[in-house]
Design a protein with these regions (language model features):
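Substrate-binding pocket helix/loop in short-chain dehydrogenase/reductase
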Residues: 98-100, 104-112, 216
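Short, small/polar-rich loop/turn modules that mediate ligand/substrate recognition or access, typified
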Residues: 175, 180, 246-248
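Conserved glycine-rich cofactor-binding loop
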Residues: 8, 15-16, 39
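Short C-terminal tail/terminal secondary-structure segment
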Residues: 94-97, 148, 224, 235-236, ...
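Residue(s) in the substrate-gating loop at a strand-loop-helix junction
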Residues: 143
Length: 260
């Protein structure tokens, strides 16, 4: 018996990294997975990997920051699996690394839409489907940057803080419908994205990439970065019946890094 047997889940940002790891693990735990991402090639690759491992999945090419595309995403999930009762809002691009005085409106809108508007839209259109089946679980993948900040990443910090506030508000609003809403706030996650962040931070601070990476690791009491699997484990807990009485919570998965 898997922890998600009988569940039907949408996972956004399922093209690679955390999203791909979520898709593979959730399918192994018994969920039928709607893999959504902007890149057709990558999201189809994720879905192929899920199916090759014996899981159930469908790929939907979708920009989760566009209302019409999210409507189509939800309709496709219901058509394929008959219902939707779980949502992981994982989509989001960290945007550029710049001083605030150089951060353009285009930079701002892109990052807010990618990280925050996408979570709002997916939740808006999935909630009616959850109500139909008597409840569900929503997990927003935020970031430690939304709680403690990160220099030169004002759009990303703001969007991720918005996801935390959204989690609190939706948990209260949706509780009467038996819909639980929680949030996972990763620290630095090993992979291509953190490599780009480190490079950008090093450039604006005038230090080497190696120095920036060392400083980031030293900030963590456990002296390491976290992995995609660490984030998957936390998300799986929130989506499973193990967390049946847990809602409105933010779980920091950050190797012990303080929030403030």
């Amino acid at each position: 018996m898997g922890l998600l047997d009988g569940k039907a889940v949408i996972i956004t940002g399922a093209s690679k990294g955390i999203g791909r790891a979520l898709s593979l693990r959730f399918a192994r735990e018994g969920a039928a997975v709607v893999c959504a991402a902007r890149s057709a090639d990558l999201v189809k690759e994720t879905t192929a990997q899920v199916k090759a491992a014996g899981g159930r999945a469908v790929a939907v090419v979708c920009d989760a920051a566009r209302e019409d595309e999210v409507r189509r995403l939800v309709a496709a999930g219901v058509k394929e699996f008959g219902k939707l009762d779980t949502l992981v809002n994982n989509a989001g691009d960290g945007g550029v690394t710049k001083p605030v005085q150089d951060y353009s409106m285009e930079d701002w809108r892109y990052t807010i839409d990618s990280c925050l508007t996408s979570s709002y839209l997916c939740t808006r259109f999935v909630v009616p489907e959850m109500i139909k089946v008597g409840g569900g679980a929503i997990v927003n993948i935020s970031s430690g940057a939304g709680r403690r900040g990160l220099p030169y990443r004002i759009g990303y910090c703001s969007a991720k803080a918005g996801q935390v506030g959204m989690t609190y508000g939706m948990a209260l609003e949706l509780a009467p419908h038996n819909i639980r809403v929680n949030c996972v706030a990763p620290g630095a996650v090993e992979g291509d994205r953190i490599d780009r962040v480190i490079a950008g931070q090093a450039q604006v601070r005038g230090i080497s990439v190696d120095e920036m990476r060392k400083a980031m690791i030293e900030r963590s009491p456990l002296k390491r970065m976290v992995t995609a699997d660490d984030i998957v484990d936390a998300t799986l807990f929130f989506c499973s019946d193990m967390a049946r009485s847990v809602s409105g919570q933010v779980l920091a998965v950050n190797a012990g890094e303080p929030a403030g």
